[in-house]
Amino acid sequence: MSSQIRQNYSTEVEAAVNRLVNMHLRASYTYLSLGFYFDRDDVALEGVGHFFRELAEEKREGAERFLKMQNQRGGRALFQDVQKPSQDEWGKTLDAMEAALLLEKSLNQALLDLHALGSARADPHLCDFLENHFLDEEVKLIKKMGDHLTNLRRLATPQAGLGEYLFERLTLKHD
């Protein structure tokens, strides 16, 4: 059944939004895996785990924001299977942060592609939605992860375990 409120909302945009919902849910699932990996007793980097669990929540909220927008525009939310994270063992914080940065860059590219599609389909509402809720936040997160990687690489010495511990205590501290 078609929507009575749908206006200037192309089927290509609708499908791309559904794909982005899935990407955000997959990212949330991956960050949840990362968060609880670093919280294990044999890894014990609580601050790193907290950092990734917060990202899991942010990505889930992003998926919900897209779903609400989809309904407001008269689109239909079509859920797909959420792929499990690529691994269960994440290694050191440096390895995990590199994987997270790649994930965020792929999400950012998907957002940019959706923005370009919205521009091509003359959908100013979609472009405004992306600009106000996603694009700037994504760039800030990529910068933050890049900064964390720079500091983690500085600490990657023969005493890498000590460096990882100090990074976790000094950079990712939380109350």
Swiss-Prot record:
Residues 7-156 form the Ferritin-like diiron domain. The modification N-acetylserine is found at residue 2. The keyword Iron applies. Belongs to the ferritin family. This is Ferritin light chain. It holds the Pfam family Ferritin. The keyword Ion transport does not apply. Keywords: Acetylation, Cytoplasm, Cytoplasmic vesicle, Iron, Iron storage, Lysosome, Metal-binding. It comes from Canis lupus familiaris. Fe cation binds at residues 54, 57-58, 61, 64. Oligomer of 24 subunits. There are two types of subunits: L (light) chain and H (heavy) chain. The major chain can be light or heavy, depending on the species and tissue type. The functional molecule forms a roughly spherical shell with a diameter of 12 nm and contains a central cavity into which the insoluble mineral iron core is deposited. Interacts with NCOA4. Stores iron in a soluble, non-toxic, readily available form. Important for iron homeostasis. Iron is taken up in the ferrous form and deposited as ferric hydroxides after oxidation. Also plays a role in delivery of iron to cells. Mediates iron uptake in capsule cells of the developing kidney. Delivery to lysosomes by the cargo receptor NCOA4 for autophagic degradation and release or iron. InterPro entries: Ferritin, Ferritin-like, Ferritin-like_diiron, Ferritin-like_SF, Ferritin_CS, Ferritin_DPS_dom. One of its GO terms (molecular function) is ferrous iron binding. One of its GO terms (cellular component) is cytoplasmic vesicle. GO terms for biological process: intracellular iron ion homeostasis; iron ion transport. It is found in: Cytoplasmic vesicle, Autophagosome; Cytoplasm; Autolysosome.
